[in-house]
């Protein structure tokens, strides 16, 4: 009986693979079933904000953030314009004016997305990280939670800061000391704030149950 069941299972698996639908492995991303409460235009639980319903100040913010279809955190934050305005300013400083290399900015964002299992953030920023010059081997180290010993000093510290602050809820003394040596006190505050910024974004997207447009690039359950 057991041999028959095993044979039947192998036959089913063979049919699935032959049809081009191999079951996902830990290294593959798959689409989640979309819940009934998602809005079809936004891919989240919120209806889209219509530009013509906004006042002039809100329209300026809408246009500045490139909000067009209701997808993503910029659109969601428009439900609270003061939050949108203040967080836009903070994000702009941390990403573009803090002095941190663009590739390291993207690395900090990716490790945050990985530790928060934030599919939307990861799927948006993996291509941006490659464009900024972050090597695929480093991206994969973060994506698949691999050991960091092969990374450069700066990259390793940023990954360990993110893993400690979010995953372990604790950054150890050695990691902190290495971070200060490499980036200075202000740099560490900037990196920690960048991690916090995208952790907050991940929480907002989680509450909204924001789905990606197509297929997630992040393997999560």
Name each region found by the language model.
Residues 1-10:
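Bacterial N-terminal signal peptides that target proteins for export
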